Amino acid sequence: MSDFSASDPNQPPPVAGQGGSPPPPPPPNLSPPPGYQAYSAAPTPVSGSLSRVSGLSKAVVILAAVAAVGSVVTAITTPGAVDSARQFRDGAISESRFLDDYTAYGLTQTLQGIGTLATAVLTIIWLYRIAKNVRVMGRATTWAPIWAVFGWILPPVLIIIPFLMVREMWKASNPDVGLGAEQWKQGDENPLIIVWFVLYGIVPAILTVISSSNALSAGFEQDAEDVARVLDESGSVTILGSIVSAVAAVVWILVVRQLTARHVAFTNER
């Protein structure tokens, strides 16, 4: 009679091979099931069809040009808005006159922001397609396609992610490296991507810190006097930021055109 008893639930059941017959041996000629793939530390290539990027890149270029024009207009109109703010602070014009001038100035900034936002949305789709295509082509990239989305919406301190991703997509789209080869990882760099990152990421981050300190000093509930003071004190930063944004948009247009041409040659898009 076995020592295991249902009346003693704290006692474990007997283990095969201990006090009983040994377990049967595995059947010979075992083979993995169909579709089985061994674990690999490398990123898994994406299956599916290639997506077209050339037409989308043209839309990105057009919207980036619109954003650049908006930045130039903002840079041109800012001195007038700053002058109006100073006159209001000195009592030379009324509050209603200053607010009218500021509303017109704010409209140009709004239009610039809309152009920039539209460019960002299409850029995300464009970069996602490129990241997916290179994996369909067998490139084991570090940055998965989903990072084309999250890389732009994560906190600003992680703005380096889009730079690293665009940089890797440039290398992965090298048409001179055959499929299955890994030499693309040591491929040539595009210096324009670095210039774009400095103009789009680093310089605006510094300017944002400077302008934010002026805005926060006025508090969240600002009256016309507070708005005029902030505009007066941060006018030069706004002008510089608009110029940098315009140049960054132009550089981005060049990056998009060059990366698209390289990627189209790699995927043989027609």
Regions found by a protein language model. Name each.
Residues 101-118, 202, 232-248:
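Hydrophobic alpha-helical transmembrane segments
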Residues 1-48:
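Intrinsically disordered, low-complexity Pro/Gly-rich regions
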Residues 29-72, 80-99, 122-150, 160-201, ...:
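Membrane-interface extramembranous regions at the lipid-water interface
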Residues 153-156:
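All-alpha RGS (Regulator of G-protein Signaling) helical domain and cognate RGS-like helical scaffolds
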Residues 21-24, 39, 110, 205, ...:
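Intrinsically disordered, low-complexity, compositionally biased regions/tails
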Residues 201-208:
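Aromatic-anchored segments of alpha-helical transmembrane domains
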Residues 209-246:
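Extracellular/periplasmic helix-loop-helix junctions in multi-pass membrane proteins
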